[in-house]
Amino acid sequence: MSPWRCIAEQLVEYEEPVDAKAYFDKIICLWKEYPNAISNRINTSVPVEEESQVWNEVIANFESKYRFDPANSSELSIFKLIQRDYKRQSFSNNCYEVAFYEEELLVRFYPIVLDGQQHPHFESPYSIACKIPSNSSILLQFFKPVDTPDDHFEFLKTLAFKQLVTWLKSIDLSKTTRKTHSLLDKESYISTYRHIREDLGRPLVEGWTENSKPQKVIFEDCGIASYIQELITSGILPKPRKFVDIGCGNGLLVHLLNKIGIPGYGVDVRSRKVWKTTLSHVDLRESPVDPQIVVENRPHFDADVDLLIGNHSDELTPWIPVMAAKLNCNFFLIPCCPYNFFGKYLNNGSHLGPKRMTSQYESFFEWTVSVSERLGFDTKMDRLAIPSTKRLCIIGRVPEKGLCPSLEQTIEHMTQGQKFVARPREIRNNNCMHISVTDRERIAKKLFDFILNASDDVRDGWRCGGEVPLAQLAGQLTDDDKKLMKDQDGGLQTFLRNHHQIFHVFQATARLRDFRQPVVSRRQQTNPKKQEATNRPKQPCWMSLNHPDGCPLGPESCRYLH
């Protein structure tokens, strides 16, 4: 092998002394496990089992190509790289990277393909290394073989190196990193996901009529359905006779699971429009779920239900392990909004041990895990690869020896004998919308006048007023005004946003809305029908009636009635 030359380096400094070796090992681990963070061509990486047939084939190919045997190298590892677009014939679907430590702070990477196609990650060998200028700094370096053209490494020494530096700066060795799909065969999951997304999800996207963004909503449920299928395939969960998706929302997950041969139904306190259109053939039931009924041993679900699913089930989330325990069945749960048994979850961290700091969501997740464990479930946790910020899941399986022997007392102790109150079928959306018309108009006019008089700025003959901090604007409200907003679960900013024809709120300031400078919402960008609907005149033009210069657009161009 030819000599190596450094093509990129950066010094990273810390406020306190750091363990450089531990930091280096951590970023190497991240680099191997998350190639998708480096290249959008790669979906994931899968470690190759040592001394397996594939391992030996890769090593033989390596020796033939690079003319040396890596078998005696320190911490030798081989990863298979799964490309994102498997239909692209120009890239290899049988590609690998061989990595080993040549020195304590130097790792060599060598690409290998077994099908003669182009490697989708990096086609040439490269190295990652670091030096230790001081006990509170690390010099990170990238190397390439001297005889390899520089243009092969343009991406590696810019964007890829930048990601590596970002990791090095943000490492927290005290924090446990949850690996994505740690319970599954990643390659098998990707194959299942591709099938469900393309064969079932893609037609749904093309025919989607809801306001929500179809790619996110549908592909997220494709990922969850794929994950549940792989739990069953791997034996982590047995195939259910029938599942019930509690708080099923739009019902897409129920539809997808049914389509891949997993029988079950969904239940939600409120039906959705899509139930009667796209998903009219799916068993989706409009009914409140009362866990107290299950706790009291009264029938609530179909008798043959043996898997409970909670996908963002809000206030029912902690009750799903409890209901599963009473039914002696398994459960799959993705906690979302933090609720305890009878209200909002408050992070006191008592279940996490002394002096452990954590986020609200992490604390809630760990508390929900502790509920499952106290009930006696064989409890596993994992991280899903879905387009959501809440993607940690809990899998609870009834062990062969059964759940905890004192189940009734455990449930009574956890719930403290209180009664669950289900949410109403129709949720009243306050947000300052039910303040009387007289009060709304009075407050809006007062705030309008204050902003208008805050500046003498005039644009094309129209007085624009000033840009006023919300804190200053709040000073114009009386105690009675504030109480009106508070009673409606809102505040000044909510009130202003509700009157978007008059006010524009941006970064803790408010100014008058000037429709000569239109602002299109993200919802309107993703839904042209919504944009068209908002352009139709429905309300009188506030500026025409109240602004001393009238409407800046005039009746021909204004979207409101003149």
Curated annotation (Swiss-Prot):
UniProt keyword annotation of Zinc present: yes
GO cellular component terms listed in the entry, alphabetical order: cytoplasm
InterPro entries in UniProt: SAM-dependent_MTases_sf, tRNA_uracil_MeTrfase, Znf_CCCH
Domain of life of the native organism: Eukaryota
Residue numbers spanned by region Disordered: 520-546
Catalytic activity, EC: 2.1.1.211
GO biological process, one term: tRNA methylation
Keyword field: Cytoplasm, Metal-binding, Methyltransferase, S-adenosyl-L-methionine, Transferase, tRNA processing, Zinc, Zinc-finger
Zn finger region (C3H1-type): 535-562
Swiss-Prot/TrEMBL catalytic activity: uridine(44) in tRNA(Ser) + S-adenosyl-L-methionine = 2'-O-methyluridine(44) in tRNA(Ser) + S-adenosyl-L-homocysteine + H(+)
UniProt subcellular location: Cytoplasm
Functional description taken from the UniProt entry: Probable adenosyl-L-methionine (AdoMet)-dependent tRNA (uracil-O(2)-)-methyltransferase.
Protein family per UniProt: Belongs to the TRM44 family.
Protein name: Probable tRNA (uracil-O(2)-)-methyltransferase
Organism lineage string: Eukaryota, Metazoa, Ecdysozoa, Nematoda, Chromadorea
